[in-house]
Amino acid sequence: MQLNVNGAQAIEVSERTFGGEFNETLVHQAVVAYLAGGRQGSKQQKNRSDVSGGGKRPWRQKGTGRARAGTSRGPLWRGGGVTFAARPQNHDQKLNKKMYRAALRSILSELVRQERLVVVEDFAVDAPKTKSLVSKLGGLGLSDVLIVSDAVDQNLYLAARNLPHVDVRDVLGSDPVSLIAYDKVLITVPAVKKFEELLG
């Protein structure tokens, strides 16, 4: 199949990488696994055995007229432990490489179908100036965009760093969430070739 290149001749690309069917279930699984992997998982609260004190019973068992109490650190008490206290846990979800690559192929194919993938010969800025990048993106009619190149250009990265709806990634740094989070994905021809190598 062919991909149109902005201001240049169309290029021949792999049908498998850029023209496959959209597998919503697989993409959802990849996104959930990616987001789960980003969770810190260090949240911890104290249950009744973790809080200090509460060893001595507050009052004797019988004769006070009050309800019996064996500790002052139960969940019903002020200063007591939490009933179902959160514990540190690992939220990682296993996703096979084959499934992950298939999800990326599915996303790229859907971006092409929705005309959200903008291919350019090359994309760079002369100096790390946000103004020049905004001007360049404006010329292409882009504002909410992920820029993917085969290798991250330092000037481009610094110029985009202060823009809230612009991100710069290389091919290896692209993930399912970033690829679907933006209105458009601006990708260079070398990056397209690299995606084909990795996912083909």
Swiss-Prot record:
One of its GO terms (molecular function) is rRNA binding. Disulfide bonds: none annotated. GO terms for biological process: translation. It comes from the Bacteria. Keywords: Ribonucleoprotein, Ribosomal protein, RNA-binding, rRNA-binding. The keyword Ribonucleoprotein applies. GO terms for cellular component: ribonucleoprotein complex; ribosome. Pfam families: Ribosomal_L4. Residues 38-75 are annotated as: Disordered. InterPro entries: Ribosomal_uL4, Ribosomal_uL4-like, Ribosomal_uL4_dom_sf. One of the primary rRNA binding proteins, this protein initially binds near the 5'-end of the 23S rRNA. It is important during the early stages of 50S assembly. It makes multiple contacts with different domains of the 23S rRNA in the assembled 50S subunit and ribosome. Forms part of the polypeptide exit tunnel. Belongs to the universal ribosomal protein uL4 family. Part of the 50S ribosomal subunit. This is Large ribosomal subunit protein uL4. The lineage of its organism: Bacteria, Pseudomonadati, Pseudomonadota, Gammaproteobacteria, Pseudomonadales. The gene is rplD.
